[in-house]
C-alpha cells in the first residue's frame, strides 16, 4: 500500500498482526546454514593409487631411442628442407665411399692371399723337382761307382795275368802245321771211290756200294 511503512509491511509486521479468527501460523523451519561442514578426522580421504600399467605398454629403451632418432631425422629433414636433403646425400655419399674403400681393401687382401698360395705351390713344385734331381744324381753316382769298381777289378786282373794273355795271343797267330793238311788229304785214298776221284780221266771209276741202282719196272729184264 502506498504510504505504509517498511516496518509495517515487513514480514515481522505480518507475523505480529494476524487477523482475528484465523488459525495460528505454523512454526517456520530454520534455514540451513551455508557454511561447509567441518572435516572429521575419520572422514579424511585416502590417496588412491593409480593402477600399474601393463608390461606390454612399456616400451624398451632401445625402441624409444630408435623412435626418437627416427622422429629427429624426419623432423630435421622436413624442417631443414634442401639443407637436410643435402646433408643426407652427403652422409650417404660418405657411407658409399667407406664401403668402396672397404671393398678395395678386401680385394687387395684376397689378391695377396692368392699370390701367397701360388708362391707356395711353386715352391712345392721346385722342391719336388730338386728332390727328383737329387735321386737321379744318387742313382748315377751309384752306377758310376759300380763301373769304377769293375774297371779297377779289370785293371787288377790285367796286371796279374797280362803275361799269360800276351803269350796266348802270340801262339794263336801261328799257321796250321803241314802235317794236318797232309793227313786231311790222305784220307781220300783210304776208300775205293776216293782214289778214283783223285785220278779222274785216267780210267773208269770203280763201282761204289752206295750207288743207287736204277728202278726195276715190269718191262726191265731180270738178271
Swiss-Prot record:
Primary role: DNA-binding factor that regulates the expression of a subset of genes and plays a key role in tangential, radial, and lateral expansion of the brain neocortex. Regulates neural stem cells proliferation and the production of intermediate neural progenitors and basal radial glial cells affecting the process of cerebral cortex gyrification. May control the proliferation rate of cells by regulating their progression through key cell-cycle transition points.
Subcellular location: Nucleus
GO BP of this protein: cerebellar cortex morphogenesis; neural precursor cell proliferation; regulation of cell cycle; regulation of cell population proliferation
One GO cellular component term noted in the UniProt record for this chain: nucleus
Protein name per the record: TMF-regulated nuclear protein 1
Sorted UniProt keywords: Cell cycle, Developmental protein, DNA-binding, Neurogenesis, Nucleus, Transcription, Transcription regulation, Ubl conjugation
Native organism: Mus musculus
Ranges of biased composition (kind: Gly residues): 73-84
InterPro entries the record matches: TRNP1
Chief location category: nucleus
Signal peptide feature range: none
Tissue/organ expression: Expressed in brain and kidney (at protein level). Also detected in spleen and intestine.
Post-translational modification summary for this protein: Ubiquitinated, leading to its degradation by the proteasome.
Region span, Disordered: 1-84, 196-223
Keyword Cell cycle listed: yes
Sequence ranges of Pro residues compositional bias: 21-54
Subunit relationships: Interacts with TMF1; may regulate TRNP1 proteasomal degradation.
Any GO molecular function: DNA binding
Amino acid at each position: 500500500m502506498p504510504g505504509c511503512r517498511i516496518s509495517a509491511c515487513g514480514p515481522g509486521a505480518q507475523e505480529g498482526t494476524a487477523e482475528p479468527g484465523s488459525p495460528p501460523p505454523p512454526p517456520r523451519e530454520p534455514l540451513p546454514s551455508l557454511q561447509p561442514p567441518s572435516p572429521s578426522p575419520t572422514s579424511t580421504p585416502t590417496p588412491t593409487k593409480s593402477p600399474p600399467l601393463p608390461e606390454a605398454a612399456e616400451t624398451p629403451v632401445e625402441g624409444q631411442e630408435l623412435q626418437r632418432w627416427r622422429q629427429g631425422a624426419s623432423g630435421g629433414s622436413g624442417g631443414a628442407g634442401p639443407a637436410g636433403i643435402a646433408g643426407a646425400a652427403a652422409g650417404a655419399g660418405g657411407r658409399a665411399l667407406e664401403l668402396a674403400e672397404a671393398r678395395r681393401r678386401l680385394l687387395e687382401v684376397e689378391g695377396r692371399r692368392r699370390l701367397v698360395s701360388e708362391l707356395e705351390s711353386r715352391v712345392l713344385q721346385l722342391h719336388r723337382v730338386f728332390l727328383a734331381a737329387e735321386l737321379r744324381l744318387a742313382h748315377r753316382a751309384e752306377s758310376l761307382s759300380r763301373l769304377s769298381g769293375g774297371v779297377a777289378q779289370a785293371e787288377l786282373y790285367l796286371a796279374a795275368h797280362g803275361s799269360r794273355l800276351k803269350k796266348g795271343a802270340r801262339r794263336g797267330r801261328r799257321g796250321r802245321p803241314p802235317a794236318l793238311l797232309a793227313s786231311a788229304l790222305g784220307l781220300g785214298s783210304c776208300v775205293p771211290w776216293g782214289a778214283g776221284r783223285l785220278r779222274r780221266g785216267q780210267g773208269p771209276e770203280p763201282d761204289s756200294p752206295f750207288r743207287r741202282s736204277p728202278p726195276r719196272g715190269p718191262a726191265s729184264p731180270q738178271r
